[in-house]
From Swiss-Prot:
A Pfam family that the UniProt record links to this protein: Thioredoxin
Thioredoxin domain residues: 1-120
Name of the protein described by the UniProt record: Thioredoxin-like protein CXXS1
SUPFAM superfamilies given in the database record: Thioredoxin-like (SSF52833)
Organism: Oryza sativa subsp. japonica
Family: Belongs to the thioredoxin family.
Length: 133
């Protein structure tokens, strides 16, 4: 199973969500395969959000069993509004299409705890089979 990345993303294990339809596709596919999703909602102009990119990528590299998504709140406003994102960065843990945890703010230790706990509690071991076209 492999996640194919969009052009320009390089070796990143974090998938950038470009539109609402992509969000729905990623969350649905991960849910259908029993994989959790961790989503980072940020903005290109938000320094605290940008400061979390390295840690988020690091977590994605060490947890291939979880689908990591990045959503720019300015580019995908509909999803940001649906989830009630009011500050950046905001991180969501999603399982079976439901938000099970939310962290607001640049707190790398808390995000790591959330990711580590989700990997253990969900007992997933293989990466989601998501293809980005």
């Amino acid at each position: 199973m492999e996640i194919q990345q969009q052009k320009g993303v390089g070796n990143s294990k974090v998938v950038k969500v470009e539109k609402e339809e992509s969000w729905d596709l990623f969350v649905n596919q991960a849910s259908n395969e029993g994989h959790p999703v961790v989503a980072h909602f940020g903005a290109s102009w938000c320094v605290t959000s940008l400061s979390m990119n390295y840690k988020f990528e690091e977590l994605a590299q060490t947890h291939p069993e979880i689908l990591f998504l990045y959503v720019d709140v300015d580019d995908v406003q509909s999803v940001s509004s649906k989830l009630g994102v009011k500050a950046m960065p905001t991180f969501f843990l999603i399982k079976d299409k439901e938000v099970v945890n939310k962290i607001v703010g640049a707190n790398p230790d808390e995000v790591k705890k959330m990711v580590d706990a989700s990997a253990e509690s969900f007992g997933v071991t293989a990466p989601p089979d998501i293809v980005v076209e």
